[in-house]
A protein has these predicted regions:
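ATP/nucleoside-binding phosphotransfer catalytic cores, i.e., glycine-rich phosphate-binding loops
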Residues: 234-236, 271-348
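Short, high-confidence coil segments that cap the C-terminus of an alpha-helix
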Residues: 114-115, 172, 303
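ATP/NTP phosphate-donor binding region
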Residues: 31, 35-120, 127, 348
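Internal helical hairpin/lid segments
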Residues: 240-292
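Membrane-embedded catalytic cores of phosphoryl/pyrophosphoryl-handling enzymes
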Residues: 1-54
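Catalytic core of DAGKc-family lipid kinases
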Residues: 78, 97, 134-240, 246
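Glycine-rich, charged/polar anion/phosphate-binding loops
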Residues: 52-53, 214-218, 225-231, 251-257, ...
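Short hydrophobic-aromatic micro-motifs
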Residues: 183-189, 195-196, 237-245, 250-252, ...
Length: 348
């Protein structure tokens, strides 16, 4: 309605010809339609699955909590956050990671001397903290201090005030984690070009919006990267984009953004073959029309365990956006309800 009033005013005052305004409406409508196909609107928080909460000892001043902070996260956001937390949870012990530290070793040492392990950093730092918490049978408190904070958003501890409330009230829940070759991930894992796709898309989102960012990122990745042969359930496919989710993501298609249920015990495997120009055109058209699930280049598999072989040689695996080692087989499994995290009733 607002756009219509603006268009009318521009025509009435003579600032634009009616044909210019009409063309603008058509172009805007087309972009909106494409955007809804590429990145469907987020569902209302009330539609997410209810998550069970357990109660542990309240810690109103942070008693027994050890917080490991990555001060370099998100241009110093970690350091700024820890300063504020000292006032809210004055009895909490704080450990800062230095550039020379082995993050996993710091987490393990902190967990060995804590009743609650807390972490302030990006998804990679949180991943290391989660493994230490599981190894020492401790609850984990996640303070969002990274760039995107995917896991903190998923468990409902964004912004940080929610984590503070959960610690003070003693409310926790259990969530799934997943492993690729016995290395943990909390959100996603991938091989091939998917990590590049996410990096480009998220870099552009704030400047050109999510729909166009997804389109540009997809085209760049499709044009530059070679496919990787993958064998799953005895069938070999050429994969240009391969996504693995800890839990089932929504929406369907190749722009997964969020999870409704963090306790479903499932892996979400999505494979897209855009290794040839013809395949890229078919995939792009399917994305624009919302028909990606119907084209032969796209495949989805949900299972608690998967084995993915790379018959043509090793590729580099990424976990939660951090690029790791070269592998020629991915043994992936879900560990259902393996991690206890502080969270509030609201899941989003």
């Amino acid at each position: 309605m607002l756009a219509g009033l603006v268009g009318f005013s521009r025509t009435a005052t003579g600032a634009h010809y009616p044909s210019d305004v009409a063309a603008g409406f058509i172009l805007g409508g087309a972009v909106a339609a494409v955007g809804r196909r590429l990145v469907p609107p987020a569902s209302s928080p009330t539609r997410s699955q209810p998550q069970e909460l357990d109660h542990v000892a309240p810690r109103p001043a942070g008693e027994g909590v050890t917080l490991v902070v990555n001060p370099a996260s998100h241009s110093g956001r970690g350091a700024a956050l820890s300063s504020g937390l000292r006032r809210r949870l004055p009895r909490m012990r704080i450990v800062e990671i230095t550039p020379e530290d082995d993050v996993a070793a710091v987490m393990a040492a902190a967990a060995a001397d804590a009743e609650v392990l807390a972490v302030a950093g990006g998804d990679g730092t949180v991943r290391a903290a989660a493994q230490a918490a599981i190894d020492h049978d401790l609850p984990l408190a996640v303070f969002p201090a990274g760039t995107f904070n995917h896991f903190a958003r998923a468990v409902g501890t964004f912004p940080a005030a929610r984590t503070v409330r959960a610690i003070q009230r003693g409310t926790v829940g259990r969530v799934d984690v997943a492993y690729v070759n016995d290395e943990i991930f909390l959100n996603t894992a991938s091989i091939g070009a998917y990590t590049d796709f996410v990096r480009v898309r998220e870099k552009l989102e704030k400047t050109i919006g999510k729909p166009l960012a997804a389109l540009v990122a997809g085209w760049r990745v499709m044009s530059k990267n070679r496919s990787v042969a993958v064998t799953v359930d005895g069938r070999t496919r050429d994969s240009s984009l391969l996504f693995l989710g800890n839990g089932q993501y929504r929406p369907q298609g190749f722009a997964p953004r969020s999870r409704d249920d963090l306790q479903d015990g499932l892996l979400d495997l999505r494979i897209l073959d855009v290794s040839t120009r013809g395949a890229r055109i078919v995939a792009l058209r399917a994305i624009l029309t919302g028909q990606l699930g119907r084209v032969k280049q796209y495949h989805e598999i949900s299972a608690p365990e998967l084995e993915i072989a790379l018959p043509n040689g090793p590729a580099r695996v990424a976990r939660d956006g951090e690029v790791g080692e070269l592998v020629d087989v991915l043994r992936v499994r879900s560990a259902r309800r393996a991690l206890t995290v502080y969270r509030t009733r609201r899941s989003r």
